């Protein structure tokens, strides 16, 4: 399936933003944050069940992603790569929460 011009343009914007962020430009980080926050918040909330925990997960996920941005091989795939980080961060948070509840019962 061929990608639309809009999809291609968006992918190019992500590639440019990642390159910009890696070069130390705040604008690159701002674009990556602003263009992914809504959708990734929805993912985090689906896992966590409430806004506060979802925001915590998302904050942790952004820190991880921006710290490891240099490991991303295909800059155009930032949204998918970041989505995986959000999901994994949420799963880890749920496991910690579950362990904490179990520990409190003992």
Which residues are covered by each model-predicted region?
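Intrinsic, short, N-terminal disordered tails of RNA polymerase sigma-factor systems
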Residues: 1-16
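Short, charged helix-capping/linker segments at alpha-helix termini
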Residues: 3-5, 22-31, 41-60
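Hydrophobic side chains within well-formed alpha-helices
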Residues: 14-17, 28-29, 57, 78, ...
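Sigma70-family region 2
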Residues: 22-23, 62-77, 96-98
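Hydrophobic/aromatic residues within well-ordered alpha-helical segments
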Residues: 32-36, 40, 86
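Phosphate-coordinating loops and pocket residues in cytosolic domains that bind phosphorylated ligands
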Residues: 34, 59, 83, 95-96
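Structural recognition of an alpha-helix C-terminal capping motif at a helix-to-coil junction
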Residues: 42, 56-63, 76-88
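Arg/Lys-rich amphipathic alpha helix in sigma70-family domain 2
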Residues: 70-73, 87-105
